[in-house]
Swiss-Prot record:
Glycans are attached at N262, N302, N483. One of its GO terms (cellular component) is cytoplasm. Interacts with ANKRD26. Interacts with DYNLL1. Interacts with FAM83D/CHICA. GO terms for molecular function: cargo receptor activity; hyaluronic acid binding. Residues 420-430, 442-451 are annotated as: Hyaluronic acid-binding. Keywords: Cytoplasm, Cytoskeleton, Glycoprotein, Hyaluronic acid, Phosphoprotein, Repeat. This is Hyaluronan-mediated motility receptor. GO terms for biological process: cell-cell signaling; cytoskeleton organization; hyaluronan catabolic process; receptor-mediated endocytosis. The lineage of its organism: Eukaryota, Metazoa, Chordata, Craniata, Vertebrata. It comes from Rattus norvegicus (Rat). Residues 150-331 are annotated as: Required for interaction with FAM83D.
Length: 498
């Protein structure tokens, strides 16, 4: 009886172990499928990671290209600044040249104005000298006229004196004639007295008359000569007076002309003085303008110098920056080229790997799809297996409880029942055992079919994945347990052995 109990316990333990092994196999198959799913998900994550790395490399390449463009833009900007610097320098140079040209023109204009002013001053001096000469000539002519008038007046006075003397002499002669007549009368009166005295007086009278005639003739001739001379002198005086009048009129006309010319010259002088003042004002304005221009030119030169220094400094700094940037750009281009080469090699490798991975992923995807299509009909079975496993686990727990209860009750029965009852109970247990064996054989056949399906699916999956795992039939081959059929069937135990 003890051997039967131990055999039943061993059988229950064997069945329980087989059931647990079956559950473990189902769990391993489910875990393997989950592992395959996780591997495929990991492969997809790796593919996404590779895509992200490719995208990062593309972004890095775009950043390097944009940085290269920025360097090119900075180079173009520096060239524009240099061109602007050159334009500013050329503009300042042109402005300085134009200002110097304007200053040269203004200087030449100022020289021309000064020359014209000097010519005007010379003309004014010449006009003043001509006017002075004309004044001196007029004064000389006036003096000559006055001296000539004085000479004429003195000659007229002399002639008048001579004529007066002649007239006085003529009056004296007439008076003498009257006296002579009186004397003749007296002589005639005295003739009577004395004949000698009369004759003497007559002779004397005759002599006196002859002398008087001579003197009268001389006086008459002198008077005629004086009259002729007076007439000539008067004619000459008239001619001279006419000439003087003509000369005076011409001189007056010339004086008027000279006055007009003088007025004109004075006006010209005034205009020239005004023009000189204007020129002086223009000169002052030009000098102030020149000073302003010189100041502006100086400021421009200073600003140009400052700008040139600033531009040189900026240019040198920009050139240094450009040199540094070019060196950095060269270094970065070299690094970038090396990195590009490395990245290109990596990209080539990655592209090759990605291509291989893509091909492999496509292959795995196709295999997965095929596997999924193939395992899709079995998914429900796997789910059913999982549910059945859970149910079996639950049933195992319940069976364990029932077994413990049955063991307890069986121990109680064996301890409290008689032999007949024990035999009946053993027969009942045998029937239940045979029934359980038939159920176990059914479950084994189902489990074998499932194992075959799982092994086939696992083989296809391993073949698709190229994975070599342990051989499940060999791993699950337990020669000492379920894989060995009993050579002799179980016999009924001897009920009398107890």
């Amino acid at each position: 009886m003890g051997g039967g109990v131990s055999y039943v316990g061993w059988l229950e333990k064997s069945e329980t172990e087989k059931l647990l092994e079956y559950i473990e196999e189902i769990s391993c198959a489910s875990d393997q499928v989950e592992k395959y799913k996780l591997d495929i998900a990991q492969l997809e994550e790796d593919l996404k990671e590779k895509d992200r790395e490719i995208l990062c490399l593309k972004q890095s390449l775009e950043e390097k290209v944009s940085f290269s463009k920025q360097i090119e833009d900075l180079t173009v900007k520096c060239q524009l600044l240099e061109a602007e610097r050159d334009d500013l320098v050329s503009k300042d140079r042109e402005r300085a040249e134009s200002l110097s040209a304007e200053m040269q023109v203004l200087t030449e204009k100022l020289l021309l104005e000064r020359q014209e002013y000097e010519k005007l001053q010379q003309n004014e001096l010449q006009s003043q000298s001509l006017l002075q000469q004309e004044k001196e000539l007029s004064a000389h002519l006036q003096q000559q006229l006055c001296s000539f008038q004085e000479e004429m007046t003195s000659e007229r006075n002399v002639f008048k004196e001579q004529l007066k003397l002649a007239l006085d002499e003529l009056d004296a002669v007439q008076q003498k004639e009257e006296q002579s007549e009186k004397l003749v009368k007296q002589l005639e009166e005295e003739t009577k007295s004395t004949a000698e005295q009369l004759r003497r007086l007559d002779d004397l009278l005759r002599e006196k008359e002859i002398e008087l005639e001579k003197r009268t003739a001389a006086h008459a001739q002198a008077t005629v000569i004086a009259q002729e001379k007076y007439s000539d002198t008067a004619q000459t005086l008239r001619d001279v007076t006419a000439q003087l009048e003509s000369y005076k009129s011409s001189t007056l006309k010339e004086i008027e002309d000279l006055k007009l010319e003088n007025l004109t010259l004075q006006e010209k002088v005034a205009m020239a003085e005004k023009r000189v003042e204007d020129v002086q004002q223009q000169i002052l304005t030009a000098e102030s303008t020149n000073q302003e221009y010189a100041k502006v030119v100086q400021d421009l030169q200073n600003s140009s110098t400052l700008k040139e220094a600033e531009i040189k400094e900026i240019t040198s700094s920009y050139l240094e920056k450009i040199t540094d940037l070019q060196n950095q750009l060269r270094q970065q281009n070299e690094d970038f080229r090396k990195q590009l080469e490395e990245e290109g090699a990596k990209m080539t490798e990655k592209e090759t790997a990605v291509t291989e991975l893509t091909m492999e992923i496509n292959k795995w995807r196709l295999l997965y799809e095929e596997l999924y299509d193939k395992t899709k009909p079995f998914q429900q079975q796997l789910d059913a297996f999982e549910a059945e496993k859970q149910a079996l686990l639950n049933e195992h727990g319940a069976t364990q409880e029932q077994l413990s209860k049955i063991r307890d009750s069986y121990a109680q029965l064996l301890g409290h029942q008689n032999l007949k009852q024990k035999i009946k109970h053993v027969v009942k247990l045998k029937d239940e055992n045979s029934q359980l064996k038939s159920e176990v054989s059914k479950l084994r056949s189902q489990l074998a079919k499932r194992k075959q399906n799982e092994l086939r699916l696992q083989g296809e999956l391993d073949k698709a994945l190229g994975i070599r795992h342990f051989d499940p039939p060999k791993a699950f081959c337990h020669e000492s347990k379920e894989n060995v059929t009993l050579k002799t069937p179980l016999k009924e135990g001897n009920p009398n052995c107890c």
